């Protein structure tokens, strides 16, 4: 709170949709600027202005929806400040449910920046993951369930892949936000704990990895703070004010 009062912008970067990220941003009192969908979108909520937006090509997106439909996967589409899906996994998602026809209409007509595909079946999602990698140029899995790369992890209730344009990264979005506000690389700090945060680290000499990050992530950052459980982000911000 002291940082925001003193003019420091605390900008949330999230794999969530803009709608979900803005709810979280308001809850924690961060600045009204959001990088969402793993960097596919950046938005200034104060001015209601799109800063950066990287759309998935409609034909490609329609192919993903068709594959998910044939294989019984759940599909979520992130666009603007909206989020829709064919099947809710949780009760609070019920109002977001819609038909495949509506999903296909949105794929054609809206600026969809991220398609989240998920399922309870780990093996089926492994096949989907390979399908995306082998069948589509111009697409990338921006984020995914950790068990895909570490099969020894405890099973989850659901497994997901966040699919976006291969031009998307949190680093690109951070760069766009810096240009928008007129920040230099020396004037920002980036903080993260995941593989998809490394691209942000490259945007500034002031990069910070969380204490709970994997060793390979910590090696990419200039500094390391304590873990999430030990208020690692707060400790970085306290050094500013």
Each model region followed by its residue ranges:
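Acidic, Mg2+-coordinating phosphoryl-transfer loop and its flanking beta/alpha structural elements
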Residues: 14, 174, 184-226
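Phosphate- and divalent-cation-binding pockets in alpha/beta enzyme and binding domains
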Residues: 20-23, 127, 173, 199-200, ...
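Short, structured coil segments at secondary-structure junctions
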Residues: 28-30, 38, 46, 136, ...
């Amino acid at each position: 709170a002291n940082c925001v009062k003193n003019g420091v912008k605390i900008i949330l970067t999230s794999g969530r949709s803009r709608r979900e990220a803005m709810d979280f941003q308001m809850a924690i009192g961060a600045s009204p600027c959001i990088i969402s969908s793993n960097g596919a979108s950046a938005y200034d909520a104060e001015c209601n202005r799109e800063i950066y937006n990287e759309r998935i090509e409609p034909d490609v997106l329609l192919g993903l929806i068709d594959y998910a439909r044939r294989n019984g996967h759940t599909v979520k589409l992130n666009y603007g400040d909206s989020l829709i899906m064919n099947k809710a996994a949780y009760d609070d998602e019920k109002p977001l449910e819609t038909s495949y026809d509506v999903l296909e209409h949105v794929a054609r007509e809206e600026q969809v920046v991220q398609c989240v595909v998920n399922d309870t079946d780990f093996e089926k999602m492994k096949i989907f993951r390979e399908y995306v990698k082998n069948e589509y140029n111009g697409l990338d899995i921006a984020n995914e369930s950790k068990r895909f790369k570490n099969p020894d992890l405890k099973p989850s209730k659901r497994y997901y892949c966040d699919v976006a344009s291969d031009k998307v990264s949190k680093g690109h979005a951070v760069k766009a936000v810096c240009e928008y506000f007129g920040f230099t690389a020396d004037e920002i700090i980036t903080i993260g704990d995941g593989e998809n945060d490394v691209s942000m680290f490259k945007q500034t000499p002031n990069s910070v990895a969380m204490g709970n990050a994997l060793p390979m992530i910590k090696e990419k950052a200039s500094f390391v703070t304590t873990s999430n459980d030990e208020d690692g982000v707060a400790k970085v911000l306290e050094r500013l004010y």
